């Protein structure tokens, strides 16, 4: 949504039909830190995997973060479908443990699609942009996410490996750039 101010973006999102929240990953992780326990984040790719993760989390009485890559979102016909499926399964399965729905390594556009769909956490991977562009997009997304009570991660530099066809060579990130991104208030 390039070129639009934050207030216009928020108005468009809220006019979209509202956002039904699950739980913010930040809220969940803050409680885990205070309680000295870990929270698992599992990327989901289909209904069966999602059901298995939710039922296991419920059985173990453990909060859980359900991660969705852009590729998995496309495979499951879109982020609105994923969010609707998770919310319906949460209700139909009687899940009572906290559940966060997280976009994992999302594009700028993917982050907005997930916000509109009702995700409670986004990870913007702007590491492939020049730093100033990454900073501008990260700043905008942090402001929008926090105004909506969502948690947000932003990436600078890269981690070695491949996901959804994106290859990170594992270069070390510039510590000053990391601090600048962290100072935005990322969660």
Locations of the language-model features?
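A generic secondary-structure signal marking the coil-to-beta-strand transition
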Residues: 38-40, 62-64, 99
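Short catalytic-loop micro-motif centered on adjacent basic/acidic residues
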Residues: 39-43, 101-102, 123
